[in-house]
């Protein structure tokens, strides 16, 4: 499946626009990662634990969006946008949302 932030796919004709599809992931932040991130904040540097969590959440949101597109017969998603939001009273949750337009593009001629 082709997934792109562009509104079209160069060299491909869009045959059918299906609908907007979403993939949402909400993940909690681990207490041990919080401690490590706090120390790195104090001393400077990057928080690998938070970065890994962010990367995993983004990949899962995109994967969920792709699956929803496939479920309705699409073979591509265009105009993809990814949003991030911190949730919870103590900002201990991260929500990642991937959205785009599910479309059917012309088949490959192999």
Curated annotation (Swiss-Prot):
InterPro entries linked: UPF0145_dom_sf, UPF0145_YbjQ-like
Superkingdom to which the source organism belongs: Bacteria
Protein family according to the UniProt entry: Belongs to the UPF0145 family.
NCBIfam families: PRK01119.1 (NF002224)
Name the UniProt record assigns to this protein: UPF0145 protein lse_0194
């Amino acid at each position: 499946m082709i997934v792109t932030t562009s509104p079209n796919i160069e060299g491909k004709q869009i045959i059918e626009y299906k609908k907007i599809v979403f993939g949402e992931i909400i993940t909690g932040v681990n207490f041990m990662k919080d401690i490590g991130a706090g120390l790195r904040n104090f001393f400077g540097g990057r928080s690998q634990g938070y970065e890994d969590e962010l990367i995993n959440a983004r990949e899962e949101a995109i994967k969920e969006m792709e699956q929803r597109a496939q479920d309705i017969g699409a073979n591509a998603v265009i105009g993809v946008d990814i949003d991030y939001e911190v949730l919870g009273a103590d900002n201990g949750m991260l929500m990642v949302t991937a959205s785009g337009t599910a479309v059917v593009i012309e088949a490959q001629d192999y």
